[in-house]
Swiss-Prot record:
Residues 215-252 are annotated as: Disordered. This is Mediator of RNA polymerase II transcription subunit 8. It is found in: Nucleus. Residues 117-142 form a coiled coil. It comes from Drosophila melanogaster (Fruit fly). PANTHER family: MEDIATOR OF RNA POLYMERASE II TRANSCRIPTION SUBUNIT 8. Keywords: Activator, Coiled coil, Nucleus, Transcription, Transcription regulation. The lineage of its organism: Eukaryota, Metazoa, Ecdysozoa, Arthropoda, Hexapoda.
Amino acid sequence: MQRDEKLFELTLDTVLQRLNDLKLAVLSMIQKLELEYETINWPTFLDNFAIISSHLTGLTKILAKEQCPPLRNRTVLPLLVSMDRDDTLINITEGRVPVFSHDIVPDYLRTRPDPITEQKMLQNEQKAANLTNDAAMKQVTQYNKVVSHVLDMVSKAREEWEIESSSRTGIQQTSSMADTQLLVAAVGMGKGLKLTNYGPGPGMMVPPSIRAPSPMGGPAMSPGNVQQQLGKAPSAVKTNIKSANQVHPFSR
């Protein structure tokens, strides 16, 4: 008798520990859904769901062991029902149940489902029992047709996607990323360009200070002087010195 009681207490402790782990996993998942719904991604959600599933699997294995006493054969009876506030009960239930009253006992110590749920379950069981084999086979056949149709649609979409992906990889590349980067660097920052000094060409603009003289008079400048003037900065003060012996070309 004592051995059975010890085994029963050990089983209850293990079940309570698994239930606490399951509760923490569910709370963590609910917290992420409520607070991190904008940043949570699908892999993180699947990881949390896998943790909850592992806790449920472990709890099921504990209850399915042969050493575990059949808990369904035991009945939980309330020893004291009171309308007064119970601090110990609040601490055990983490603030969820402040009073162990007559209104709470049927909900927390219920060994059967709610009456509405139990009625729906009985209706479904009766409906399943009244179903004939021919009707069941027809429904199964129809269900298999729907599943096969959906599977064909998914397979066709997958084949089209694979064909499109393979055709994209076979297209010959007509541009070079390295050449494009060199061209952009040369145009934008002048990278790789060399600066050379040449005389003014026929299409280049020449500053007025070094422009060739007009027919009004004045000495012509050689290309060397023009290049020398191009290399110098123009003076801030402009002077115009004329010779006294210069004759106006139109004074005849």
